[in-house]
């Protein structure tokens, strides 16, 4: 039987991870290990200064007092009964497109699976009301089945974004590149009940590059977006340019 490790960054009780676990349980044995709280924006952070505490829940899930990356690392290295065939992260409550991927704990959980040598997928639901987790779950299952039947290059993860639409309104799947957002909106300055000054980070900026071929464009037009992401952050095209510059200094 195929074994799949599921995690997320919204927390073990989030509706997205329940929808994903239930959908994948139709095709595989699923182990769900996720943070015990919302860890959105955790990126690839690891907990290095405190122990990781777990709680085995009545539904079979395991919650971890740690980050999404902690969850995947701990599950694969210690908690899983045998290695998983794949790591799937999500379904995130909100998009992970463009620059979002650098901050996303959802994407980071999948990346950790890839770091440890396993095929990995991150899936997110794009919208405000977020009513259609079922749609995202159906596409997650379809794509996972496709990967199991027809494996692709092992040096990448698939970052999937699904419009928050009924299943029959999805137009199809498009392979995309990452778009880009403007910088985040301003900091919100306020006070706590004791009068102490506090700050809230502003929301993400609007799309800067949402042209045809990007994840933003595909999702806005009713398509599921699939973007291949690599762990290697090297700007390969700039190596020779940088070498020429180094030779001059």
Swiss-Prot record:
Q: What is this protein called?
A: 5'-nucleotidase SurE
The protein's required cofactor(s) are namely: a divalent metal cation
Keywords for this protein: Cytoplasm, Hydrolase, Metal-binding, Nucleotide-binding
Q: Where does a divalent metal cation bind?
A: 9-10, 40, 92
Main EC class the enzyme belongs to: hydrolase
Molecular function, one GO term = nucleotide binding
Q: What does this protein do?
A: Nucleotidase that shows phosphatase activity on nucleoside 5'-monophosphates.
Enzyme Commission no: 3.1.3.5
Which InterPro entries does this UniProt record tie to the protein?
SurE, SurE-like_Pase/nucleotidase, SurE-like_sf
Range of residues in the leader sequence = none
What superkingdom does the record give? Bacteria
The annotation note on the cofactor reads: Binds 1 divalent metal cation per subunit.
What GO CC terms are in its UniProt record?
cytoplasm
Location in the cell reads: Cytoplasm
Catalysed reactions, semicolon-separated: a ribonucleoside 5'-phosphate + H2O = a ribonucleoside + phosphate
Q: What protein family is recorded?
A: Belongs to the SurE nucleotidase family.
């Amino acid at each position: 039987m195929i074994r799949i490790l599921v995690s997320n960054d919204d927390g073990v009780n989030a509706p997205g991870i329940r929808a994903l676990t239930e959908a994948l349980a139709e095709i595989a044995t699923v182990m769900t290990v996720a943070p015990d709280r919302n860890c959105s924006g955790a990126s690839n952070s690891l907990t290095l200064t405190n122990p990781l505490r777990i709680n085995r829940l009545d539904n079979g899930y395991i919650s971890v007092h740690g980050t999404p990356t902690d969850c995947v690392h701990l599950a694969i290295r210690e908690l899983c009964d045998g290695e998983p065939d794949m790591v799937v992260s999500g379904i995130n409550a909100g998009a992970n497109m463009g620059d979002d991927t650098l901050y996303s704990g959802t994407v980071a959980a999948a990346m950790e699976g890839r770091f440890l040598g396993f095929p990995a997928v991150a899936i997110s639901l794009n919208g405000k009301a977020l009513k259609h987790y079922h749609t995202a779950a159906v596409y997650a299952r379809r794509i996972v089945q496709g990967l199991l039947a027809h494996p692709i290059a092992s040096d990448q993860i698939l970052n999937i974004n699904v419009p928050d639409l009924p299943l029959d309104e999805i137009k199809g799947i498009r392979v995309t590149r990452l778009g880009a957002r403007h910088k985040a909106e301003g900091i919100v300055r306020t006070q706590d009940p004791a009068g102490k000054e506090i700050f809230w980070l502003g929301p993400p900026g609007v799309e800067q590059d949402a042209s045809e071929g990007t994840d933003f464009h595909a999702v806005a037009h009713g398509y599921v977006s699939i973007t291949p992401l690599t762990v290697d952050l090297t700007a390969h095209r700039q190596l020779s340019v940088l070498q020429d510059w180094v030779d001059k200094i």
